[in-house]
Amino acid sequence: MDISYHEKISKTYELIKKSTYSVAFTGAGISTESGIPDFRSPNGLWQRFRIVTYQEFIIDRKARNEFWKMKRELIQEIINAKPNNAHNALAELEKRGLLKYVITQNIDGLHQMAGNKSVIELHGNQRGYICLDCEKVYPLEEVLKMLKEQELDLRCEVCGGIIKPTIVFFGEPMPEKELLMAQQIANKCDIMFVIGTSLQVEPAASIPRIAYQNGAKLIFINKVQTEWDWIAEIIFYDSAGKVLKDILDVIKSEKF
């Protein structure tokens, strides 16, 4: 028999009280409440745009045009987005010493904006851009200017090389340092909140499994089911902002 929502909140609070090393693993679903679309939902990015792989981006000008067209449409949504209740709750948990790390697949920077200091970005971020030839770094502001003034194939002003955002494309290796750190944290944690992710993108999706295999209690917060729900100790099929705020409210009321 399923336990009630309030019983789940209470059980989560009891787990947090006993925890010495809790972490959060987040995906696109945590940021939808901030107005940033996710990938796989009926209104997600892959319903609106084709996936451009890393190999396509490198060799195919038409694919780069498609990517930058998508980026030009979406970048303002990301820039205008503000942290929501879920981001703010995770930042408050860290501030109280109840959360060691946030491991995120997101590129929006909202965890840092909310106040989290210990954030591992598995898929990079949208703040930086780099020439693939001479490695000149371009800030976001300069890229925005280029997108307004140039055709949709951004080139380095120094050497003419292809400019690429510092995000991880499909088919591109994940940054080794960040992946190794995430794996080490997953090995050590005793609680992992798994929030807003379908757990379909490898190797990032392996992180919660590593935590589970090493004895951690997993708390899933998703609006939909995933194929890995069976490894969770507690599952909330609800808004991340609502659930995390309610958990935080209990912590505050208990003065923990």
Swiss-Prot record:
What are the EC numbers? 2.3.1.286
List residues binding Zn(2+). 131, 134, 156, 159
Per UniProt, the keywords (alphabetical) are: Cytoplasm, Metal-binding, NAD, Transferase, Zinc
UniProt enzyme class: transferase
The protein's annotated catalytic reaction(s) are: N(6)-acetyl-L-lysyl-[protein] + NAD(+) + H2O = 2''-O-acetyl-ADP-D-ribose + nicotinamide + L-lysyl-[protein]
Please provide, in alphabetical order, the Gene Ontology terms of the cellular component aspect for this entry: cytoplasm
UniProt key word Cytoplasm:
yes
Cofactor(s) recorded for this entry are:
Zn(2+)
- GO molecular function terms listed in the Swiss-Prot or TrEMBL record: histone deacetylase activity, NAD-dependent; NAD+ binding; zinc ion binding
Record-annotated residues binding NAD(+)? 28, 32, 39-40, 105, 107-108, 123, 197-198, 222
Please state where this protein is localized: Cytoplasm
Tell me where it mainly resides: cytoplasm
Per UniProt, residues of the Deacetylase sirtuin-type domain are 1-254
Locate the active site.
123 (proton acceptor)
Q: Which residues bind nicotinamide?
A: 39, 107-108
The protein's matches in SUPFAM superfamilies, at most eight in alphabetical order, are given as: DHS-like NAD/FAD-binding domain
Task: Tell me the cofactor note.
Answer: Binds 1 zinc ion per subunit.
Report the HAMAP family cross-referenced here: Sirtuin_ClassU
According to its UniProt entry, what is the function of this protein? NAD-dependent protein deacetylase which modulates the activities of several enzymes which are inactive in their acetylated form.
Family label: Belongs to the sirtuin family. Class U subfamily.
Protein name as it appears in the record: NAD-dependent protein deacetylase
User: Which species is this record about?
Assistant: Thermodesulfovibrio yellowstonii (strain ATCC 51303 / DSM 11347 / YP87)
Q: Which gene encodes it?
A: cobB
